[in-house]
């Protein structure tokens, strides 16, 4: 943690100029006070290494202070504000199940806030606070361009180690009449408009079996919803290539590394590569 603070102070002092960022693409990340240092560094490394020049917006989990926001402004990053919150809540106030879960489960912001606040953008990117864009990253911008150019909804996820949903992927496929749900992780993806439909999210959350499944594995609820949305017949859903995969132990030669809980202690190693 001491090393992370050293990197944090270095990036805070040197800052980052994001004034020429494209408005057509927005990169979102979600964190609060607890993950602030890591999230701050990940936002810097995205801007330095991803090959994508765009606005970076932190979805505030409600714990970021004015000091945190000032620090983020030093690297050209903005945070969601009260007006954004009102806009988001207005978008779901007629969707009772979505609204209820949004109030109870912070990771629903990865679905709802992204959909509402990316209105008018050609492409959006999402990365968790523990996703690190490495210096070896050289092809990610290609997938951003593909999403921009594709006619119709398209999304790329990084591949998870195994299917990780509120129940088995086979049960989900049967319940929602889907085929071949991808082994995806919703902590890192890039897509164009049209993937998320709030009315369909409400329909999923209204399903009695889905409600029962979430009682046992609620922490992957938003990931499961993304998997269902991305498996609709009108969505072109793909996995990013192997050098973006979530791997345990982490492969330090990958273009990005997703330092999930089991390997988060190795995050500092990625900064030294």
Predicted feature descriptions by range:
Residues 1-23, 265-273:
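Membrane-proximal basic amphipathic "stem/tether" segments
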Residues 45-53:
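Short, acidic, metal-binding catalytic loop of nucleotide-sugar glycosyltransferases
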Residues 55-62, 156-157:
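Short internal beta-strands
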Residues 67-120:
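Active-site-proximal specificity loops/subdomain of glycosyltransferases
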Residues 124:
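Short aromatic/hydrophobic "clamp" motif used to bind/position activated sugar donors
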Residues 128-132:
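The conserved acidic donor/metal-binding loop of glycosyltransferases
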Residues 133-167:
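Conserved donor-nucleotide/metal-binding helix-loop-beta segment in metal-dependent transferases, i.e.
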Residues 176-264:
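Catalytic core and acceptor-binding pocket of nucleotide-sugar-dependent glycosyltransferases
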């Amino acid at each position: 943690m001491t090393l992370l603070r050293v990197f944090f102070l270095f990036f805070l002092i040197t800052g980052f100029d994001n004034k020429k960022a494209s408005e057509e693409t927005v990169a979102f990340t979600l964190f609060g006070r607890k993950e602030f240092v890591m999230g701050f560094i990940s936002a810097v490394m995205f801007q330095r290494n991803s090959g994508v020049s765009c606005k970076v917006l932190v979805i505030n989990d409600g714990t970021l202070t004015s000091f945190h926001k000032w620090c983020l402004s030093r690297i050209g990053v903005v945070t969601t504000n009260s007006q954004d919150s009102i806009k988001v809540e207005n978008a779901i106030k007629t969707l009772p199940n979505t609204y209820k879960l949004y109030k109870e489960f912070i990771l629903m912001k990865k679905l709802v806030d992204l959909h509402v606040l990316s209105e008018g953008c050609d492409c959006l990117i999402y990365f968790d606070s523990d996703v690190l864009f490495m210096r070896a990253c050289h092809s990610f911008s290609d997938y951003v361009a593909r999403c921009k150019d594709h006619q119709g909804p398209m999304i790329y996820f990084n591949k998870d180690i195994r299917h990780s949903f509120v129940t088995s992927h086979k049960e989900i496929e049967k319940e929602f009449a889907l085929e071949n749900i991808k082994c995806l992780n919703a902590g890192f993806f890039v897509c164009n408009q049209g993937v998320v439909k709030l009315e369909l999210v409400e329909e999923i959350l209204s399903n009695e079996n889905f409600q029962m499944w979430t009682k046992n594995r609620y922490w992957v609820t938003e990931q499961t919803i993304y998997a269902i949305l991305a498996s609709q017949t009108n969505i072109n859903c793909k996995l990013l290539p192997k050098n973006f995969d979530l791997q345990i132990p982490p492969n330090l030669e990958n273009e990005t590394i997703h330092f999930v809980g089991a390997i988060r202690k190795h995050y500092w190693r990625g900064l030294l590569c």
